Amino acid sequence: DCNVPRCTTGKYLKERPSFTLDPAPHAGAYYVQEAASMFIEQAYRKISADFTPERLLDLCAAPGGKSTLWRSLLPDGALLVANEPMRQRAEILAENLTKWGHPDVIVTNAYPNEFSGCCGMFDVIATDVPCSGEGMFRKDEGAVTEWSPANVVTCADRQWSILCDIWPCLRTGGYLVYSTCTYNRLENEEMVARICKELGAEIRSEEH
């Protein structure tokens, strides 16, 4: 086993064991996720160099892997709001964060526009938005059959709607962390450019 370069607590495994037979993840001792998801620690280092976040919203949080990492990085006393719009997925999110065991977490089941009363409330908003899933091709044949150029456009439209709904909830000088699990420019580089142009954001870093 070896360390994930961008995450001090992440480990690569040489082979995939049967996690369901290991009591440790069921007790919240560790969480299994793709190494790519662990970019969060790199993002947090950039943020914490400017200020220490007190309130972070993980907007599309289920099943909870990124939320566990955000919560591990945040200081004690900071609040993580882990949200999932889909009810069944929100229940899974709540279960995983309950296992993780940190008290300063609130799990919500709301659509982005339902946060309209939280104007300027959050120091950081993490948006791992629903996408066309091109990053899933290597392990999910269904993702390949579901993909189409039209679906890419549909996903980009949905992402923009989500961003417009949630943008007012970010305080002045706060950070929006935008991520997808897809590769096309429309949902990534072009979306980030649109966020900057139409919402007035500034790119903090272009490091990859």
Tell where the protein language model's regions lie, with residue ranges.
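S-adenosylmethionine
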Residues: 1-207
